[in-house]
Amino acid sequence: YLSIKSGNSKNAVCSGSERVSTWMKSEKCDSEVENLKELDEQPIIAFKKDFLRWMLSDGAAAFLLQDTPNKEGLSLKIEWMESYSYAHELETCMYAGGDKLADGEIKPWSDYSSEDWLKESVFSLKQDVKILNDNILIKGVESMKSAMDKHQLSSDNIDYLLPHVSSNYFVQGLFDEFSKKGIHVPLEKWF
């Protein structure tokens, strides 16, 4: 995108893929679960891992970007892009190759003995669902509101909304949070 925008290129392919399913198969966790005797006393350990098994999925996409509109067929115009991070404000939410301590610090795998790698589920992908639950809607809407204000975009200008939600569980909460911030996009425009 930036290469085309700067005039350096006329065409570019932008692609991305994610294949988390290989991490999420239950058999990848079997030996760890056998070692987690405290699982009955601390079911949150299983939830931190299982939550992701149902929320993440494989996906891929590619776009051909060009410096001029397509002469035949549909063309989409990129008018602007924004990206926001809250890593400077919030604790780590998703992690692998370590474990999260009570104070929020991430202890890396290299600080564990090799015997503890499986015992402590160090290499499993985990998510701090409390951090997620407390912040996902608020920060998602905050970034949307900032982008809309910066680019003077009103809700009336939105024909379709493709929100980044992993589950319908988040849709009503996101809609409500948008409404609180003055972003009124009817659900029938959501895809």
Predicted regions: what is each one?
Residues 20-22, 168-169:
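Short, active-site-adjacent cap segments at secondary-structure transitions
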